[in-house]
Amino acid sequence: MLAGFGNGLADAAWNAWIGNMANPNEVLGFLHAFYGLGAVLSPLIATTMITKGSKLPWYTFYYVMIAMAVIELATSVTAFWRETGAVFLAANPRTNNTKDNRMKEALVRLPNARVTWLCALFLLGYVGIEVALGGWIVKFMLEVRDGEDFASGMTATGFWMGITVGRIILGFVTPRLGEKLAIAIYLPLTMALELIFWLVPQFYVSAVAVSFQGFFLGPLFPAAVVAATKLLPRHLHVSAIGFAAAFGGSGAAIFPFAVGAIAQAKGVQVLQPIILALLGVILGLWLCLPRIHKKQE
């Protein structure tokens, strides 16, 4: 719980900070691509440590995690040491005369609250889709597609690799199309791939489809952060993006649990219609956002 709390704070800070940089889609794409890369490499490293060679105890991987946490601490301190509250308030004065605190202004006062809540709900659904697919795809491939253990495990690796590559490559495409249009294209493509994954009962077709799903899902989180920075006044960026990222992160707990509970009763094949429905919901939420005007640097 404490680790999740700390990472949530750091996640919000990094997203808000980079979202205000020049070329934020590209830079955020690289930032979130490393998340996907970690999701690919960590299980492979942990499995190798436990099963190969000297077969180290399972808890040995926690030493690797501690080392990564030290690196995260060092980079965060270096980036934000001078970014005190006083510096932030001086650099981001209010653009109106309201006496509300910034969090209340972001969550309650229209029109800013509309953007904050739409982005938060969008990220809630997106993170739920990402983690539910990444977590349940192996079981689906084993039980429904009758895959071998190794090949089924590699489909999850392919999904996370798709997310990593998509965040890098599409991070350069998204700003040229505009965030609103780009995501309105990526999501229907993802839904089409989800239908192929669901309705074509071939192992390799499903494996390829889920990898490309990851590719088109990858840029959604960075694009939502960039959209929030363009639609909200600068003094609300940290409050609104921090809330949206934290609220969205709860999707990683809610939706995989819900899928698991339903799968327990109905079978893991329920994964596909649930994912398809969630994709439709977040597409609707995205289309409800106001028109995004080109950001003037």
Model-based region annotation:
Residues 8-22, 219-233:
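Intracellular juxtamembrane helix-capping segments at the cytosolic ends
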Residues 19, 23-34, 149-150, 232-244, ...:
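Loop-to-transmembrane helix entry/capping segments in MFS-fold secondary transporters
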Residues 24, 30-90:
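Helix-loop-helix hairpin linking two adjacent transmembrane segments in secondary transporters
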Residues 50, 166-179, 263-264:
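Helix-to-loop junctions at the C-terminal end of transmembrane segments
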Residues 88-119:
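Juxtamembrane intracellular "pre-TM" segments in multi-pass secondary transporters
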Residues 109-165:
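Extracytoplasmic gate region of multi-pass secondary transporters
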Residues 174-224:
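C-terminal transmembrane helical hairpin of 12-TM major facilitator-type secondary transporters
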Residues 231-270, 275:
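A late C-terminal transmembrane helix in Major Facilitator Superfamily
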